[in-house]
């Protein structure tokens, strides 16, 4: 069994026990003990107010993945803490999210909130760089813009649990623009140039040419590139 099994299942107690039995984890083990066994949370290179917010997310991760608190209860505790910190105790979640955005953006950071694979976790980064690629497709060359996201401070729960070993590589905006986290990609690799870029560019071309196209047809056509 590999340690990734524990992370994918959100089993930090199991991961720590595994690390204690395997010499190759001796350097990283103290960091896990500090956070999850001792509740000594990480501080990030951001203003104190933002660190206070990120600390609440870290407590949520410890509650959920180490202490065994049901996610719904941990989430309720997280949201209550955020509302108290931002002095908006009766706010709906949508309004709370807007306020969180504003707080981070006021300090010069980009932010995305919500859940990834069932768990809360913010994405906080410093710079968005729109980059235009010329993509060769079966029907000709198409321009496709990708947002390269740089200078990540926080990359949601899987990145946090694994100290960056695993984590989200990016996401699509509502308008179809792909956002790629710089540290997650080799931008000269086949994984990026073919598996992601050509695939998504073909989707964009097809949606413009065939407005009524089904998701199944989109995927079929993208597999042909």
Name every feature range the model reports, one short phrase each:
Residues 178-196, 213:
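Short pre-active-site segment immediately N-terminal to the catalytic Zn-binding motif
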Residues 15, 20, 24, 214-225:
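Post-HExxH zinc-binding segment in Zn-dependent metallohydrolases
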Residues 1-110:
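N-terminal low-structure segments adjacent to metalloprotease catalytic domains
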Residues 101-179, 186-187:
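Auxiliary, metal-adjacent structural segments of Zn-dependent hydrolase domains
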Residues 194-208:
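Active-site recognition of the HExxH zinc-binding catalytic motif
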Residues 1, 83, 168, 190-197:
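Mature, well-folded catalytic/scaffold domains that follow N-terminal targeting or propeptide regions
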Residues 129, 182-184, 202, 209-210:
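Short, flexible loop/turn elements at secondary-structure junctions
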Residues 79, 122-123, 179-181, 224:
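Ordered hydrophobic segments in well-structured contexts
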């Amino acid at each position: 069994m590999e340690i990734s099994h524990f992370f994918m299942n959100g089993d930090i107690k199991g991961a720590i026990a595994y690390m204690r039995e395997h010499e190759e984890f001796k350097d990283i083990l103290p960091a896990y003990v500090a956070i999850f066994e001792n509740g000594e949370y990480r501080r990030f290179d951001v203003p104190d107010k933002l660190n206070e917010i990120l600390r609440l997310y870290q407590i949520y991760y410890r509650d959920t993945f180490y202490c065994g608190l049901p996610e719904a209860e941990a989430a309720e505790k997280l949201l209550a803490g955020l509302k108290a910190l931002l002095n908006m105790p009766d706010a709906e979640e949508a309004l709370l999210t807007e306020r969180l955005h504003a707080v981070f953006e006021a300090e010069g950071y980009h932010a995305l909130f919500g859940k990834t694979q069932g768990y809360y976790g913010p994405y906080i980064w410093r710079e968005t760089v729109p980059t235009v690629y010329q993509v060769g497709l079966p029907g000709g060359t198409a321009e496709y813009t990708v947002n390269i996201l740089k200078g990540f401070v926080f990359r949601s729960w899987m990145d946090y649990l694994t100290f960056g070993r695993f984590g989200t590589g990016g996401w699509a905006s509502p308008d179809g623009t792909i956002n790629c986290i710089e540290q997650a990609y080799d931008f000269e690799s086949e994984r990026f140039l073919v598996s992601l870029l050509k695939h998504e560019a073909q989707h964009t071309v097809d949606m413009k040419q065939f407005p009524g196209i089904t998701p199944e047809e989109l995927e079929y056509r993208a597999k042909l590139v």
